[in-house]
């Protein structure tokens, strides 16, 4: 294990991950699902963190290979899994192994996405890259609120990962310059060395983010001069010298691309997960966090419990129109194990306020005055929000890795 400085200017922790068995021809890809453990300060056990990084690196390598070789041809309407199978199945060698691996690992989810995306390929709101990846870009919302405890496209990890990959590639290359409008004959196939270099770049970036925390990338929480947004990360394509995807050549270019993609996924995952936390109500005065989002809501609640002078105590109603009562439970428990205690609109407003603070800290938003507050004993709300963000980011990456 060593601390390196990447070509993007960000420190990354390099962790060697051995190839796992059963990779089905996709270089270094483990088929183990990632899980969450409690042995790490950031919420992931060491072994599970490696599994998550390895799985994500394999998935993102497959997406890059598809983008490079297919150029969008054969993917429209047929589904990503089907397009890969048809386009690569007869090419032999690396292409054949990649086709078999991706169809085995991803085929079900991707064919489902393809059928969804195929219905939207004529929409003017979907970019060419979204269309090629079978993504309905209109299905993702910043707030997921409904009348029932239901799931949506935003809760599908594969849909999320594909959408993030699409956004990052557009940031790096722009529409029409990323290989998605090529002919059905396909684009340039990266060599085995270039594929390995890309995968190493993704692995290094994700390992650094999950090991050191997003706060280290932004500079001590992003609150004391750290860079917010995409600054300093190469996500604007600056690290690639303005080249298009089809113009990349050699391991150095592909490792920089992998580092940019891994960094982008690592920066987007937690914020997107916060945006996707869903709630439902059984009346205008009683709300609940959706069951599938309660583990993440608990992390937010633990942050809120550190600052009662800012967030107060949770309030609830036993039934519509009944008396509002102050809960004797902590925010963490009230949000994650509400029983039949519906949270009041005022308490939900406090929950959303805390979400906003954590998102601001994760994005390095130095202009949010709320992050400068001090708690009991001089504790910094901004730093604690960033620590909560690190844990949430790792949880989000763990879910994506289990796709």
UniProtKB/Swiss-Prot annotation:
GO biological process, one term: symbiont-mediated perturbation of host programmed cell death
Gene Ontology CC annotations of this record: extracellular region
Subcellular location: Secreted
Low complexity bias: start-end ranges: 113-129, 137-156, 174-187
Secreted listed as a keyword: yes
Region (Disordered): 113-157, 173-195
InterPro entries named in the record: HrpN/Z
A Pfam cross-reference name: Harpin
Keywords of the record: Hypersensitive response elicitation, Secreted
Role, per record: Elicits the hypersensitive response (HR) in the plant upon infection. Harpin elicits HR in non-hosts and is also required for pathogenicity in host plants.
Family: Belongs to the harpin HrpN family.
Protein name, entry field: Harpin HrpN
Phylogenetic placement of the source organism: Bacteria, Pseudomonadati, Pseudomonadota, Gammaproteobacteria, Enterobacterales
């Amino acid at each position: 294990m060593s601390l390196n400085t990447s070509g993007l200017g960000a420190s990354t922790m390099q962790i060697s991950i051995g190839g796992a068995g059963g990779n089905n021809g996709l270089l270094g890809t483990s088929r183990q699902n990632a899980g969450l453990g409690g042995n790490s300060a950031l919420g992931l056990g060491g072994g599970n963190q490696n599994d998550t990084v390895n799985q994500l690196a394999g998935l993102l390598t497959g997406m890059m290979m598809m983008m490079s070789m297919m150029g969008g041809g054969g993917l429209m309407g047929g589904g990503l899994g089907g397009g890969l199978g048809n386009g690569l199945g007869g090419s032999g060698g690396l292409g054949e192994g990649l086709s078999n691996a991706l169809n085995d690992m991803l085929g079900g989810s991707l064919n489902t996405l393809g059928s969804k995306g195929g219905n939207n390929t004529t929409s003017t709101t979907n970019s060419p890259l979204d269309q090629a990846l079978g993504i309905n870009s209109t299905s993702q919302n910043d707030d997921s609120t409904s009348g029932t405890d239901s799931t949506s496209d935003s809760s599908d990890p594969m849909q999320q990962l594909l959408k993030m990959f699409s956004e990052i590639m557009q940031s790096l290359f722009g529409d029409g310059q990323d290989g998605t409008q090529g002919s059905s004959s396909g684009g340039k196939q990266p060599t085995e060395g270039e594929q390995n270099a890309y995968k190493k770049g993704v692995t290094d970036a994700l390992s650094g983010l999950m090991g050191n925390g997003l706060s280290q990338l932004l500079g001590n929480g992003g609150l004391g001069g750290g860079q917010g947004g995409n600054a300093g990360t190469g996500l604007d394509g600056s690290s690639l010298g303005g080249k298009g995807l089809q113009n990349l050549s050699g391991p150095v270019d592909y490792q920089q691309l992998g580092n940019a993609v891994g960094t982008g996924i690592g920066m987007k995952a937690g914020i997107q997960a916060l945006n996707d936390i869903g709630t439902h109500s059984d009346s205008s005065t009683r709300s609940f966090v959706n069951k599938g989002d309660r583990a993440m809501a608990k992390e937010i609640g633990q942050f809120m419990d550190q600052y009662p002078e800012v967030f107060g105590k949770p309030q609830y109603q036993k039934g519509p129109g009944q008396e509002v009562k102050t809960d004797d439970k902590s925010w963490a428990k009230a949000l994650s194990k509400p029983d039949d205690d519906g949270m009041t609109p005022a308490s939900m407003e406090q929950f959303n306020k805390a979400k906003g603070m954590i998102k601001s800290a994760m994005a390095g938003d130095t202009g949010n005055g709320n992050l400068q507050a001090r708690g009991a004993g001089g504790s910094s709300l901004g730093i604690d929000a960033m620590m909560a963000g690190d844990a949430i980011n790792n949880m989000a990456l763990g879910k994506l890795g289990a796709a």
